[in-house]
């Protein structure tokens, strides 16, 4: 089986693939202080819960693919693969890795690995032109051309960051649960804040995507818009531009990149 690991700033998502099918997944907090040994213990606990894997770390795993937006965690995971997974092929998404997607930006090495991986999956699953909206710590919008090229995108503050900022900077406001309110017009402070988050982000998505689509294609209706990320369901029902919801888009992209690189190892 293939173990895929997507390390974000807030959460780390792990997926287990049997061929092209994802058969198990986990979401844990990202902690840059964890050592390779601590990560190995954590992985062993998660892997041990799956009936098709053995008790020892690495049993049943024949490949690993990792992308990370936190360099220190990527370093420790590299140590995990070296020390605990022995001869299991491991592909870490970093400069030099073959993705199959040309990166047509001013500074390609500055583009986050997760954003490139999302583009890889979008091209494979839906073709171009496409826009991927990833609701993570930041909300990112990434554009793929009709020729399958990554051409850039937009980075905006994420939902959780915005909620925390309201609670910290607003003297009479507090941190709230991110939930859909009863109506757009809030009847109390909490509902008013929830409305601002849910409908504000839905409006942001619609506005940004519409502008990007006009730049991306002669006919904006030709652009496929894919939503992913842990908080995507909060906006899905309120946005008018999202065509597809694929919660495991990044993990699928990691599987594709692994397959394109493992033969070179």
UniProtKB/Swiss-Prot annotation:
Pfam families: Pan_kinase. It comes from the Bacteria. K(+) binds at residue 134. Its main location: cytoplasm. GO terms for cellular component: cytoplasm. Homodimer. Catalyzes the phosphorylation of pantothenate (Pan), the first step in CoA biosynthesis. This is Type III pantothenate kinase. It comes from Streptomyces coelicolor (strain ATCC BAA-471 / A3(2) / M145).
């Amino acid at each position: 089986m293939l173990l895929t690991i997507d390390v974000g700033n807030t959460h780390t998502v792990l997926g287990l693939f049997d061929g092209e099918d994802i058969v198990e997944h986990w979401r844990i907090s990202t902690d840059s202080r964890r050592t390779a040994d601590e990560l190995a213990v954590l992985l062993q606990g998660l892997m041990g819960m799956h009936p098709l894997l053995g008790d020892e770390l690495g049993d049943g795993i024949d490949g690993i693919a990792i992308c990370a937006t936190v360099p220190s965690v990527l370093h420790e995971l590299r140590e995990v693969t070296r020390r605990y997974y022995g001869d299991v092929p491991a592909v870490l998404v970093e400069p030099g890795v073959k993705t199959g997607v040309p990166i047509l930006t001013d500074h390609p090495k500055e583009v986050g690995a997760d954003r490139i991986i999302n583009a890889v999956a979008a091209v494979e699953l839906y073709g171009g032109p496409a826009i991927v909206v990833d609701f993570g710590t930041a909300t990112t919008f990434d554009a793929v051309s009709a020729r399958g090229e990554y051409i850039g995108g937009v980075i905006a503050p994420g939902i959780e960051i915005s909620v925390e900022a309201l609670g910290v900077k607003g003297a009479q406001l507090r941190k709230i649960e991110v939930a859909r309110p009863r109506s757009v017009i809030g009847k109390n402070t909490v509902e008013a804040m929830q409305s601002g988050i849910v409908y504000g982000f839905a409006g942001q998505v619609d506005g940004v995507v519409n502008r990007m689509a006009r730049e991306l294609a002669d006919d904006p209706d030709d652009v496929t818009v894919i939503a992913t990320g842990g908080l995507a369901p909060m906006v899905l029902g309120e946005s008018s531009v999202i065509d597809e919801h694929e919660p495991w888009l990044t993990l699928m992209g990691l599987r594709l990149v692994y397959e394109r690189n493992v033969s070179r190892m």
